[in-house]
Protein backbone atom coordinates (compact mmCIF):
# COMPACT_ATOMS: atom_id res chain seq x y z
CA UNK A 1 0.00 0.00 0.00
CA UNK A 2 2.76 2.43 -0.95
CA UNK A 3 1.92 6.13 -1.26
CA UNK A 4 -1.64 5.71 -0.03
CA UNK A 5 -3.61 7.60 2.59
CA UNK A 6 -6.74 6.69 4.48
CA UNK A 7 -9.03 9.62 5.25
CA UNK A 8 -11.43 9.02 8.15
CA UNK A 9 -14.20 11.56 8.79
CA UNK A 10 -16.08 11.38 12.09
CA UNK A 11 -19.38 13.13 12.79
CA UNK A 12 -21.36 13.14 16.06
CA UNK A 13 -23.67 15.24 18.24
CA UNK A 14 -21.56 14.72 21.40
CA UNK A 15 -18.02 16.16 21.41
CA UNK A 16 -16.75 13.81 24.16
CA UNK A 17 -17.93 10.79 22.19
CA UNK A 18 -16.22 11.91 18.99
CA UNK A 19 -12.95 12.68 20.80
CA UNK A 20 -12.96 9.26 22.48
CA UNK A 21 -13.59 7.52 19.13
CA UNK A 22 -10.83 9.53 17.44
CA UNK A 23 -8.44 8.54 20.23
CA UNK A 24 -9.27 4.86 19.74
CA UNK A 25 -8.60 5.13 16.00
CA UNK A 26 -5.27 6.93 16.55
CA UNK A 27 -4.18 4.37 19.16
CA UNK A 28 -5.09 1.44 16.89
CA UNK A 29 -3.29 2.90 13.87
CA UNK A 30 -0.12 3.73 15.83
CA UNK A 31 -0.06 0.25 17.37
CA UNK A 32 0.09 -1.28 13.87
CA UNK A 33 2.96 0.99 12.79
CA UNK A 34 1.15 3.60 10.66
CA UNK A 35 1.72 7.35 10.85
CA UNK A 36 -1.37 9.38 11.86
CA UNK A 37 -2.16 13.04 11.23
CA UNK A 38 -5.02 14.39 13.29
CA UNK A 39 -7.61 14.40 14.67
CA UNK A 40 -8.21 17.74 12.96
CA UNK A 41 -11.35 19.53 14.20
CA UNK A 42 -13.60 20.82 11.44
CA UNK A 43 -16.14 23.65 11.91
CA UNK A 44 -19.10 22.82 14.15
CA UNK A 45 -22.49 23.06 12.46
CA UNK A 46 -25.10 24.66 14.73
CA UNK A 47 -28.78 24.41 13.78
CA UNK A 48 -31.14 26.62 15.76
CA UNK A 49 -34.91 26.27 15.90
CA UNK A 50 -37.28 28.88 17.39
CA UNK A 51 -40.71 27.73 18.58
CA UNK A 52 -43.62 29.85 19.76
CA UNK A 53 -44.63 28.86 23.29
CA UNK A 54 -48.02 30.54 23.32
CA UNK A 55 -50.73 29.03 21.10
CA UNK A 56 -51.78 32.51 19.92
CA UNK A 57 -51.39 36.27 20.38
CA UNK A 58 -48.15 36.35 22.40
CA UNK A 59 -45.31 36.61 19.91
CA UNK A 60 -42.73 37.47 22.60
CA UNK A 61 -42.95 34.06 24.32
CA UNK A 62 -40.56 31.80 22.40
CA UNK A 63 -38.18 28.95 23.12
CA UNK A 64 -34.96 28.34 21.20
CA UNK A 65 -33.33 24.95 20.71
CA UNK A 66 -30.07 24.11 19.00
CA UNK A 67 -28.33 21.03 17.68
CA UNK A 68 -24.54 21.01 17.32
CA UNK A 69 -22.84 18.62 14.89
CA UNK A 70 -19.14 18.08 15.65
CA UNK A 71 -16.74 16.84 12.96
CA UNK A 72 -13.17 15.52 12.98
CA UNK A 73 -10.90 14.25 10.21
CA UNK A 74 -7.92 11.91 10.52
CA UNK A 75 -5.33 10.92 7.92
CA UNK A 76 -3.47 7.63 8.18
CA UNK A 77 -0.33 7.87 6.04
CA UNK A 78 1.39 4.74 4.70
CA UNK A 79 -1.06 2.18 6.08
CA UNK A 80 -0.17 -1.49 5.97
CA UNK A 81 -2.41 -4.56 5.88
CA UNK A 82 -2.40 -4.84 9.68
CA UNK A 83 -3.69 -1.27 9.96
CA UNK A 84 -6.62 -1.90 7.63
CA UNK A 85 -7.53 -5.16 9.40
CA UNK A 86 -7.36 -3.53 12.84
CA UNK A 87 -9.53 -0.60 11.72
CA UNK A 88 -12.14 -2.97 10.25
CA UNK A 89 -12.38 -4.85 13.57
CA UNK A 90 -12.59 -1.68 15.68
CA UNK A 91 -15.89 -1.16 17.53
CA UNK A 92 -16.80 2.53 17.90
CA UNK A 93 -19.65 4.16 19.81
CA UNK A 94 -23.13 4.04 18.31
CA UNK A 95 -23.52 7.83 18.06
CA UNK A 96 -20.52 8.36 15.78
CA UNK A 97 -20.87 8.40 11.98
CA UNK A 98 -17.70 7.19 10.23
CA UNK A 99 -16.77 7.77 6.58
CA UNK A 100 -13.59 6.14 5.25
CA UNK A 101 -11.96 7.11 1.97
CA UNK A 102 -8.84 5.52 0.48
CA UNK A 103 -6.74 7.90 -1.63
Swiss-Prot record:
Subunit relationships: Part of the 30S ribosomal subunit.
One Gene Ontology term from the biological process aspect of the record: translation
Role, per record: Involved in the binding of tRNA to the ribosomes.
The protein's name: Small ribosomal subunit protein uS10
Organism of this sequence: Xylella fastidiosa (strain Temecula1 / ATCC 700964)
Family statement: Belongs to the universal ribosomal protein uS10 family.
A GO term from the CC aspect: ribosome
InterPro entries, sorted: Ribosomal_uS10, Ribosomal_uS10_CS, Ribosomal_uS10_dom, Ribosomal_uS10_dom_sf
